[in-house]
Curated annotation (Swiss-Prot):
It comes from Rattus norvegicus. Residues 33-64 form the LRRNT domain. PANTHER family: ANTIGEN BSP, PUTATIVE-RELATED (PTHR24369), LEUCINE-RICH REPEAT-CONTAINING PROTEIN 3 (PTHR24369:SF170). InterPro entries: Leu-rich_rpt, Leu-rich_rpt_typical-subtyp, LRR_dom_sf, LRR_TM_domain-containing, LRRNT. Residues 1-32 form the signal peptide. The lineage of its organism: Eukaryota, Metazoa, Chordata, Craniata, Vertebrata. Keywords: Leucine-rich repeat, Membrane, Repeat, Signal, Transmembrane, Transmembrane helix. The keyword Repeat applies. It comes from the Eukaryota. This is Leucine-rich repeat-containing protein 3. It holds the Pfam family LRR_8. It is a single-pass membrane protein. The chain crosses the membrane at residues 205-225.
Length: 257
């Protein structure tokens, strides 16, 4: 018998390696709730409520089993790349009523398949980040943003699944065509207008102006070249006229024998 107090390897009190991994996994799932937020747990699914907390950036200590994340009514100005990549179970993300101006191209990486609703309304977004939103299958709310209506916006909208309940509230805050400013974007597009055709016309005009400029330069060079040659020819002729002529002999020619 071994010394008193030593436990055999088969003792039930000795934790196995597998149980250690299980404990670590559970700790990861049960990560602490972000400071000043509320994280009610419903049957293992966590809803994180961080509304109106004065947050300036997205919290990093969000539980991995979060299914609902409310970050609305804060002061968040940007969404960096990979901000939610550790939240594979996230189904609804509310970022409305913030000051978001910039969204990284990989800001929503890891959410493409599971996310069902993304609320970006009431922010400061001027241009739609096509790379960030184009791969999402979630319904997206973009109303009440100072959008600049242009060809890139029109092309991006074709790839997004916009929320039908708020799509009529997406308006042109600015536009290259003044008649569309302040009008609902869907109404403008349904009328047959196209920001891309305007973009192509602008490009064509710029190309024509450039070609006309080159043509004018070529014509000016040809005119200069001709006039320069004419001036040289005139000077050469005057020089020849100024040369003394050879005296003409007045003696009669002798007959050839």
């Amino acid at each position: 018998m071994g010394p008193r107090g030593r436990q055999s390897p088969s003792s039930p009190l000795a934790p196995s390696q597998g149980s250690c991994f299980f404990i670590l996994f559970c700790l990861r799932l049960g990560a602490s709730c972000p400071q000043s937020c509320q994280c009610p747990d419903h049957a293992g699914a966590v809803a994180v409520h961080c509304s109106s907390r004065g947050l300036q950036e997205i919290p990093r200590d969000i539980p991995a089993n979060t299914v609902l994340l409310k970050l609305d009514a804060n002061r968040i100005s940007r969404v960096p790349n990979g901000a939610f990549q550790h939240l594979p179970q996230l189904r609804e993300l509310d970022l409305s009523h913030n000051a978001i101006e910039a969204i990284g191209p990989a800001a929503f990486s890891g959410l493409a398949g599971g996310l069902r609703l993304l609320d970006l309304s009431h922010n400061r977004i001027r241009r739609i980040p096509k790379d960030a939103l184009g791969k999402l299958s979630a319904k997206i709310r973009l109303s009440h943003n100072p959008l600049h209506c242009e060809c890139a916006l029109q092309e991006a909208l074709w790839e997004l699944k916009l929320d039908p309940d708020s799509v009529d509230e997406i308006a042109c805050h600015t536009s290259a065509q003044e008649q569309f400013v302040g009008k609902p974007l869907i109404q403008v597009l349904d009328s047959g207008a196209s920001f891309c055709s305007t973009h192509r016309k602008t490009t064509d005009v710029a190309m024509l102006v450039t070609m006309f400029g080159w043509f004018t330069m070529v014509i000016a060079y040809v005119v200069y070249y001709v006039r320069h040659n004419q001036e040289d020819a005139r000077r050469h002729l005057e020089y020849l006229k100024s040369l003394p002529s050879a005296p003409v002999s007045k003696e009669p020619l002798s007959p050839v024998p």
